[in-house]
C-alpha cells in the first residue's frame, strides 16, 4: 500500500486555507506553514460569487458565510454627480435561482476566520516564514527564518503577492507601477439622518477617470467598505 504523500502548503490565507480544507476532506496528509504569528482579522471587503460558494459548500462553511455576509439584491452602477442608475446587475434571489448559490459581500477577515476554523489546529504551523525551498528530486526541503526546516513530497505555494515559492521557480520580478492608485477603508455604517438617501447594499460610483465602490461587509449592515 503506497503511503499518502506529505503535502505542504506555504501560506494560510484564503487560498491556502481553502486548499488545505479540500485536501483534508479527501483524507490526504496536509500541513500549512504561515509566516504570521497567529490569525488576525486582516483585509477589507471581498465579493464571493456562486462558484466560490459551491466550493465552500464542499468545505462545510457555506451556511456560516451566508449568515455572516451581506446579500445585495443588485449591484448598482451610479453616476458620480447625479446619482442616476447607469446599470444594475441582479444578484440576491436571482443568483441563487440561476446559479445555484448565493452572491455575497463580506469582510475578508471574517471569511478567512471560517476557513481557518475549518482546519484542525494541528494542521497549521504559525511563525514559519519561508526563506528557501530545495527540490532534491525525491523530497522538497523548506527552510524557515526561525532556523527550522521541514520536508514534504509536494509543496503548494499560496504565499501571496510576495511569494517566495514563485520567486524560487521563476526568479525575482520587481513590481512595476501601472499608473493606478487605490484607497480603501472599512467604516462603521453611519446612522441614517433626515434627508439622507438610503444606502445601496452594493454600488459602484462612476466618473470619467475614476470610480468608487461601496458595499456592506456584514449581514448586520454595520460596516461599510469603500475602495
Please state what every model-predicted region is.
Residues 63, 190-197:
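Short helix-loop capping/hinge motifs at secondary-structure junctions, enriched
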Residues 6, 29, 223-225:
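Residues at the starts of beta-strands that form the adenosine-phosphate
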Residues 78, 198-227:
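Active-site substrate-recognition segment that forms the wall
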Residues 16-17:
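N-terminal Rossmann-fold NAD(P) dinucleotide-binding loop
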Residues 2-7, 12, 49-188:
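Conserved N-terminal helical subregion
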Residues 24-44:
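Glycine-rich FAD pyrophosphate-binding loop
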Residues 166-168, 194-196, 226:
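A short secondary-structure junction signal
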Amino acid at each position: 500500500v503506497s503511503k499518502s504523500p506529505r503535502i505542504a502548503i506555504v501560506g494560510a490565507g484564503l487560498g491556502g486555507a481553502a486548499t488545505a480544507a479540500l485536501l483534508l476532506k479527501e483524507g490526504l496528509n496536509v500541513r500549512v506553514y504561515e509566516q504570521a504569528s497567529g490569525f488576525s482579522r486582516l483585509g477589507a471587503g471581498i465579493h464571493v460569487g456562486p462558484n466560490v460558494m459551491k466550493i465552500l459548500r464542499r468545505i462545510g462553511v457555506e451556511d456560516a458565510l451566508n449568515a455572516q455576509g451581506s446579500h445585495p439584491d443588485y449591484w448598482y452602477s451610479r453616476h458620480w454627480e447625479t446619482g442616476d442608475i447607469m446599470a444594475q446587475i441582479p444578484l440576491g434571489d436571482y443568483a441563487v435561482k440561476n446559479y445555484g448559490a448565493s452572491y455575497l459581500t463580506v469582510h475578508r477577515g471574517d471569511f478567512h476566520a471560517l476557513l481557518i476554523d475549518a482546519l484542525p489546529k494541528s494542521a497549521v504551523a504559525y511563525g514559519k516564514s519561508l526563506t528557501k525551498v530545495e527540490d532534491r528530486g525525491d523530497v522538497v526541503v523548506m527552510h524557515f527564518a526561525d532556523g527550522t526546516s521541514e520536508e514534504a513530497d509536494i509543496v503548494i505555494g499560496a504565499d501571496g503577492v510576495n511569494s517566495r515559492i514563485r520567486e524560487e521557480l521563476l526568479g525575482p520580478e520587481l513590481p512595476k507601477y501601472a499608473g493606478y492608485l487605490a484607497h480603501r477603508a472599512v467604516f462603521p455604517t453611519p446612522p441614517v439622518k433626515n434627508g439622507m438617501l438610503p444606502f445601496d447594499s452594493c454600488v459602484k460610483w462612476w466618473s470619467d477617470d475614476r470610480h468608487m465602490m461601496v458595499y456592506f461587509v456584514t449581514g448586520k449592515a454595520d460596516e461599510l467598505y469603500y475602495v
